[in-house]
């Protein structure tokens, strides 16, 4: 039996969305469709149900046929699929995944959606993650009002981050600070000449997820803006077609581009 489908890509991750009823169990369909040698090839198969009391729910199946938690990219792809196929005609709605509702907003140009914004809620910041006395002192160090952008800011999420917004800090000092951080810490240099409302990342030490890094960076700048300028700032960072915005209340929104890559059919 033939199954029609759409394949989407978001941040180099691809997922398949069936456009018709599956002719076989979801596990079997995922194995056949997601196989990159004999099938279409994808990281997962997304199925939707309208029986959830919270609205439409999404379930993700891995290429091995097992049900798996839906990653962020799968949720955004699911939202664009529902909009593209007119299952949902709203640009703002909730989509449940793994029992959790997610607030989504479709970003459109000329009536067509190019990306999806996901409400990530509020950051988890825990001052207790800093094991270094020096790092702890730097976090609470006062900054001169006459030059508020030459500062050092430490913000902790799931991973410790160090953000430098002054251009007068020698690279050796940055390296020594990173050495005092807990394992897995990341350092980033923010452009001191950029608009405080639109900070720009110049360099990053260590591998990290852009969204996590941008969330931490934007939050750091937002906190500094309220402290140094006396008013809370809404801050955005971008990297190509990926955007992160932190509101003055420190609520985080991430916008990622979602592209349709394949529209086709396959016999199952």
Regions found by a protein language model. Give the residues of each.
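Intrinsically disordered, low-complexity regions enriched in acidic/Ser/Thr/Pro/Gln residues
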Residues: 118-120
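C-terminal domain-closing interface element
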Residues: 125-147, 250-268
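A glycine-rich beta-to-alpha transition motif near the start of alpha/beta enzyme domains, typified by
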Residues: 1-112, 155, 161-268
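Glycine-enriched loop-and-adjacent helix/strand subsegments that border the catalytic/binding cleft
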Residues: 115
């Amino acid at each position: 039996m033939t199954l029609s489908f759409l394949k989407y890509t978001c941040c180099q991750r691809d997922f398949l969305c069936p456009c018709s009823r599956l002719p076989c169990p979801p596990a079997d369909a995922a194995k056949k469709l997601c196989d990159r040698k004999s099938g279409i090839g994808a990281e997962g198969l997304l199925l939707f149900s309208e029986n959830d009391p919270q609205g439409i729910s999404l379930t993700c199946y891995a290429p091995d046929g097992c049900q798996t938690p839906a990653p962020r990219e799968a949720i955004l792809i699911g939202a664009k699929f529902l909009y593209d196929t007119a299952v949902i005609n709203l640009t703002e709605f909730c989509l449940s995944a793994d029992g959790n509702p997610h607030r989504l907003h479709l970003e459109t140009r000329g009536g067509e959606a190019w990306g999806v914004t996901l409400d990530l809620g509020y950051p988890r910041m825990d001052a207790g993650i800093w094991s270094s006395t020096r790092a702890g002192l730097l976090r609470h160090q006062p900054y001169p009002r006459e030059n508020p952008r030459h500062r050092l800011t430490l913000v902790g999420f799931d991973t410790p981050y160090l953000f430098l917004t002054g251009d007068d800090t020698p690279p050796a000092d940055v390296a020594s600070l990173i050495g005092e951080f807990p394992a897995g810490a990341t350092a980033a240099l923010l452009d001191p000449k950029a608009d405080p409302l639109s900070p720009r990342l110049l360099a990053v030490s260590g591998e990290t997820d852009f969204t996590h890094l941008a969330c931490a960076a934007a939050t750091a700048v937002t906190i500094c803006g309220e402290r140094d300028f006396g008013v809370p700032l809404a801050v955005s960072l971008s990297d190509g077609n990926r955007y992160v915005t932190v509101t003055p209340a420190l609520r985080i929104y991430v916008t990622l581009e979602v592209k349709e890559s394949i529209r086709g059919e396959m016999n199952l």
